[in-house]
Amino acid sequence: MEQFEVKWGIFQGAFPAGQHLQDCFQLTRTNGFAGFELSLETSLPLLPEAYTDSTEGILAIERSVGLDRPRPGGLRFESNMNDLADIKRAAELAGVRIISISTMQLFHYPLSSPIPAIRERAIDIVKKMIDAMVYLGGDLVLVAPGMVTSEVSYQTAWQNARRALQMILPYAAERQIGLGIENIWNKFLLSPLEFVDFIDSFDSPWLGAYFDVANILQYGYPDHWIEDLGNRLKRIHFKDYRQDIGGVAGFTNLLQGDVPWDRVIKALNKINYRGWIVAEVTPYQSAPEQALKDTHSALEAIFSIKELSRSNKSCISNQ
């Protein structure tokens, strides 16, 4: 089978919550990763309209991945140009490229909300990520497309998410920043064909998929999704998931779950994927840096499957 090369990045949540962003950049480089995915956080209280039955659950997830409070030196919704300059300088000094920005804020402020104030905040959040990405030199922001709830029907979620994204897309296109729609546990866009139809309905090269191979295991097969998404795949999250545990507790480190890595790699090769692979893992409670080392080793093992490999030297030089 033909070899192919991809570039490896690491997610901000892979570092302990209290660790300064500058130190995260340094550890990213020293542990062999070329790219870094920032998380947009905030010190602002939630809008009153944002509180729902799922708020406490979302906050619990944020706490579990260290995203429940702003990281020292990190990107915040209220960050100014001086803050962005500090972040950019720290990444450059470490020799790390900031490749994308994600946020948990779109779970509190979904694009699909029927409440105008919530949708407006969601649009502002995505635009904030776009502006930061322009300054920091990356090319993609991760966007949670919305969610279906007991109060928000599937049709309402579809219509509101499309309207919101139609308002954001011209802003992103003008600044040449891609929007990566991620498959999340939102009871929305549950099949690859539906996901493709949603993306294609915008007819824009600036909107595609940010695919998570572990999120999909509850209701699909990652290799099927990768093949169906094809050239719509803008970026991919690697983590693992144990189906025998289930729920949020089922997420685990690479090679310790049920993701069929051989089929994932084969599918990526089939669609000729050459983009970033971002490891979305969490730190160990003790010796947190060891999680970075183990993740790097796991990626080496994954990309040796079926005679597929990539050169770390090439990855680092491909910034």
PLM feature spans:
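Active-site beta-loop-alpha junctions enriched in small/polar residues
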Residues: 11-15, 39-43, 103-106, 146-148, ...
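Gly/Pro-rich active-site loop or hairpin
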Residues: 12, 17-19, 24-25, 51, ...
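A short helix->loop->beta-strand "cap" motif at the edges of active sites that frequently abuts
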Residues: 94-96, 138-139, 177, 271-275
